[in-house]
Amino acid sequence: MREIVHLQTGQCGNQIGAAFWQTISGEHGLDGSGVYNGTSDLQLERMNVYFNEASGNKFVPRAVLVDLEPGTMDAVRAGPFGQLFRPDNFVFGQSGAGNNWAKGHYTEGAELVDQVLDVVRREAEGCDCLQGFQITHSLGGGTGAGMGTLLISKIREEFPDRMMATFSVVPSPKVSDTVVEPYNATLSVHQLVENSDETFCIDNEALYDICMRTLKLNNPSYGDLNHLVSAVMSGVTTCLRFPGQLNSDLRKLAVNMVPFPRLHFFMVGFAPLTSRGAHSFRAVTVPELTQQMFDPKNMMAASDFRNGRYLTSSAIFRGKVSMKEVEDQMRNVQNKNSSYFVEWIPNNVQTALCSIPPRGLKMSSTFVGNSTSIQELFKRVGDQFTAMFRRKAFLHWYTGEGMDEMEFTEAESNMNDLVSEYQQYQEASVSEGEEEYDEEAPLEGEE
């Protein structure tokens, strides 16, 4: 089977990761200690994508938990699913990274990284046919951002032909933890552009908006936000965990979603989003799911796709849905909103189906879109970065850990390049492409 090894780094990564494992354990009929007491064979059929079967009908997640301070780990261990994880797979330091990317990437993190890689190697050796890695982390902190990206590049070196998917929590415009977030995020994006195959961008502000506007929660907790993220992660990974009619794996997703290697930053959405008490008052239909899924208010990253165009997108439907209805609806969405899809990639909406819905729902859909409007997110971080970097504010925290200013300049220009690449493809049209092609043709002959 095609296994996935999961890494969670830093406080944010560990909390999202814990929520994810809680969600999928429930879907696969596992209790808090990993013992199977489900009812359906379908739950067991592809269990080993994420779980390793131990003795006594107990399943253990293929998860590696990493942090530079013991606090979050203790919280996970004390939580409802703390006994699920293999004790050797908790790898933590004592010092903390203090929201400093350089500490996570170069000093504190670098000391711990070999220990983590040993655990990753052991997990990979326990797989029949490893398809890739997924990592949950935030880009604004020290450990998740700095050490997370260090791990990604080390794993890339050792497993160059395996997929690398990241679920990255991007700093949001209004909700900020620390003042150096723009630095940490820019340095991280600089790494992700080169080393990740697919990055699912999530941001806290969009999650807050969804909680307040759609779920009618007055003061959402991080628990509520993480619950949303875990719903999306569970949706994106459905096809990998359950037999479906249209199965996909991380690589197929990437092939369908990434038209140019650098442009692999996706927006995600989930439907149906209904407040906790209101589930029983409405029936969900495929048209409703489709409409809600493509609604900008449902996107979990604070950029509005109406300001850009979709290069590609993918929808994963779960539950008892008719294939034909889904196809019709998706075609319908494309025809109605054709201006939001680039016309030089025909059929750029891909659909996958899985017959098993998430717990408590009849059907659901998860949306993954590669939209040029994600540049807003990078622009926003870039502007904040520039404002601080121009004055060299807070730089001594980074140079003190041995970083060079050059690295900041490089990261900044790499992010600006990324923004302009998105812009270039947003404006490209079919006819333009043909003319360029004709001009290039003779050159090949000359070579």
Curated annotation (Swiss-Prot):
List the cofactors.
Mg(2+)
> Where mainly found?
cytoplasm
Q: Does the keyword Oxidoreductase apply?
A: no
Tell me the GO molecular function terms.
GTP binding; GTPase activity; metal ion binding; structural constituent of cytoskeleton
**Alphabetically ordered keywords of this record:** Cytoplasm, Cytoskeleton, GTP-binding, Magnesium, Metal-binding, Microtubule, Nucleotide-binding
Chain segments annotated as transmembrane? none
Which portions of the chain have biased composition (kind: Acidic residues)? 432-447
Assembly with partners or alone: Dimer of alpha and beta chains. A typical microtubule is a hollow water-filled tube with an outer diameter of 25 nm and an inner diameter of 15 nM. Alpha-beta heterodimers associate head-to-tail to form protofilaments running lengthwise along the microtubule wall with the beta-tubulin subunit facing the microtubule plus end conferring a structural polarity. Microtubules usually have 13 protofilaments but different protofilament numbers can be found in some organisms and specialized cells.
**Protein name per Swiss-Prot or TrEMBL:** Tubulin beta chain
